[in-house]
Amino acid sequence: MIIRSPESEVKIVVERDPIKTSFEKWANPGHFSKTLSKTDPETTTWIWNLHADAHDFDSHTEDLEEISRKVFSAHFGQLAIIFTWLSGMYFHGARFSNYEAWLADPTHIKPSAQVVWPIVGQEILNGDVGGGFRGIQITSGFFPIWRASGITSELQLYCTAIGALIFAALMLFAGWFHYHKAAPKLAWFQQVESMLNHHLAGLLGLGSLSWAGHQIHVSLPINQLLDAGVDPKEIPLPHEFILNRDLLNQLYPSFAQGLLPFFTLNWSEYSEILTFRGGLNPVTGGLWLTDTAHHHLAIAVLFLIAGHMYKTNWGIGHSLKEILEAHKGPFTGEGHKGLYEILTNSWHAQLALNLAMLGSLTIIVAHHMYSMPPYPYLAIDYSTQLSLFTHHMWIGGFIIVGAAAHAAIFLVRDYDSTTSYNNLLDRVLRHRDAIISHLNWVCIFLGFHSFGLYIHNDTMSALGRPQDMFSDTAIQLQPIFAQWLQNTHVTAPSFTAPAATASTSLTWGGGDIITVGNKVALLPIPLGTADFLVHHIHAFTIHVTVLILLKGVLFARSSRLIPDKANLGFRFPCDGPGRGGTCQVSAWDHVFLGLFWMYNAISVVIFHFSWKMQSDVWGNISKQGVVTHITGGNFAQSSITINGWLRDFLWAQASQVIQSYGSALSAYGLFFLGAHFVWAFSLMFLFSGRGYWQELIESIVWAHNKLKVAPAIQPRALSIVQGRAVGVAHYLLGGIVTTWAFFLARIIAVE
């Protein structure tokens, strides 16, 4: 018998009126920082430090409780911003869009929710999107989401927009209330079991359940009527379906039985509403809404159970600390011992894990949005499909770099080696040389071999020797594992889900083509030598990004070059004067360099996606059933050389953005030009030293003094770290906007 000490009960503890609400502080810039508030802004460096440290709560105080409250309060501010943004989207849909026209004819009318005012000729940007409506074509995917939600009028969008604003105000109030009036104590933030239970059961469980309920009671009947061609104005309003059961009974007879089949385990009665079909609805080209309702109900059940698994005031359930400390293998020393203390005392450590998972999940979302398009008519809106993929890939890349940044900050600021003796984290840190040198070898191998295959092909192509190239028609390098995986997904459902009519995604294969309004929604995606080559470029760029970021994390505290690196902090330019060759070694500099390789990696991914889809998936179908792809299937033969990527993708597809002037797409031409300028501007910060600018500034200040117009705040050149931060920000912004303009001008013109 195991006798255990009685565990302390979880108490909800808050501190009343901890900090007075004061607007006077706002009039005192830098009030949050000891160093900034003591000095007046004598130089421009003070202003830069103000911006750098405003949200670095660690630099304001060392009190973890106060830091936790600030983070918690800031989360409500973030939610207020999100609700305000959503409100704006819905308001645009209500006030400036052709949503009702699109709803009536989604295959011929393009979505638009922005109309440019005629001031000095800008109305040229309002293109003809069909149905006599002139506006800017939007590519955010809101129209398909609204249709899937069961929104049938612009009045409903208005109401939702107002509701979102009310929620934004509530969030702002909550942020103020939980910092100034009733601030949680540190123990509340550290009670992980309660937090897991509430987040799993509340946010994910009840959130999924309420969405499943909405889908069943509102979305399904409205979408069924829309699919049948009923005029949206004739369809009952959402609340009528909820209040009047007879309306649902007419569409789904099993509804009349209520919850009886549920409690008698006769669940098959619900097979009209909750299905397991697989594939896509041939009318809309989206997932079957009955499948997605079933999915959300199942997810809700899982998370509601998960939200009751952790031990709080009742003596049953899991203890996170016990789970972690029991997690030991024969070769892993103390295993996960000490990680509980790390994750309950370092929010950077917890944030690093959350960002790594969220970033990966965001990239998974990007890949599912096109392969399993969840909303009606999304699959035939090629510009939206391209935008959603590109957006989620960029966001995922940034979030993963953020994970490495906060992992390094944790090691520099929060890591205590005495509590992590011989656990997995300690063992990883002690094996860092082996990890990084092996990863470096992998990067060299992948780089030379992946790029080498292209160089070989370019050379053979230039010499007129196509028979010696790696291609589907010469020396084949077929992606046999990927093809096996595709085939497995096509054949498996007949054994694992006999009731399903199709596999999870049409992209796996099987021969089915879904077309909507003479446009291809989705078809099996063939993989060949060209995909094998570019996938190894993906492997290379991802591994180099990981190498840079992981090296920054594992060497954040110390290295052979700088054994006391932890004392220098997260970001520093060099190890002081007199030690040459110690610049650009801070953890921050690794994040800086990692961002460039993340940009490389994601760029190749979105280029690959854009060309592959235009070549092998997207296109029109004739009455005879012949599919004509946008670029005529040229990916397999053109993308196997560097020259092919430059000539047949970048140059050939840039013609639309370059020739956009004088058309409704001209804004993209201007963005393309301007973003190139922003990108080039970044090089000025990245390729020149601080001293150059300081000399120039002093010369300019001399001229101002001569004219007696010298400023009171003395101008200073940016520090090395500030210059690099400004440089990478403009590099990424310029590059991403250039790509965005290039993609959208192209795809809107040809789809």
UniProtKB/Swiss-Prot annotation:
EC assignment: 1.97.1.12
Bilayer-crossing regions: 71-94, 157-180, 196-220, 292-310, 347-370, 386-412, 434-456, 532-550, 590-611, 665-687, 725-745
GO biological process: photosynthesis
Enzyme class (EC, first level): oxidoreductase
Chain sites annotated for binding phylloquinone: 693
Superkingdom of this protein's organism: Eukaryota
Protein family: Belongs to the PsaA/PsaB family.
Protein name as catalogued: Photosystem I P700 chlorophyll a apoprotein A1
Protein source organism: Welwitschia mirabilis (Tree tumbo)
